[in-house]
């Protein structure tokens, strides 16, 4: 009598990977337009685009070797949630919107990054 041996399967091999999320050409044009206006005023110096599971990030820097001054995050739509655009500074969420132009309106007012000094 022969016995069949059990086969161990790793679920990770069969699960679909989250689809990489990108900015559309229109969204990228809006972000780069905002970036170029701030560069012309001498406020921003560098930017980075990053893609993570379920999100795309556009980060702007005042100095190249610092943490981003602001990040604009595009999140992937979930079952009951549409795509969202989040403007954040560090861990603080400054604006959440379903459309990029609405999210970027926060930059129409003069924003200034305030950092508390220890003491």
Where are these regions (language model features)?
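Hydrophobic residues embedded in beta-strands of well-ordered beta-sheets
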Residues: 55-58, 85
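Short, charged/polar surface micro-motifs in flexible loops or helix N-caps
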Residues: 41, 53-56, 63-68, 78
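Short, compact, well-ordered microdomains
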Residues: 79-117
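A generic structural motif
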Residues: 61-63, 88
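Short, charged, intrinsically disordered terminal tails
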Residues: 6-9, 16-21, 105-119
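Short aromatic-glycine-(Arg/Gly/Cys) micro-motifs in beta-strand/loop hairpins
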Residues: 4-6, 68-91
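Negatively charged, low-complexity tracts enriched in Asp/Glu with abundant Ser/Thr
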Residues: 4-56
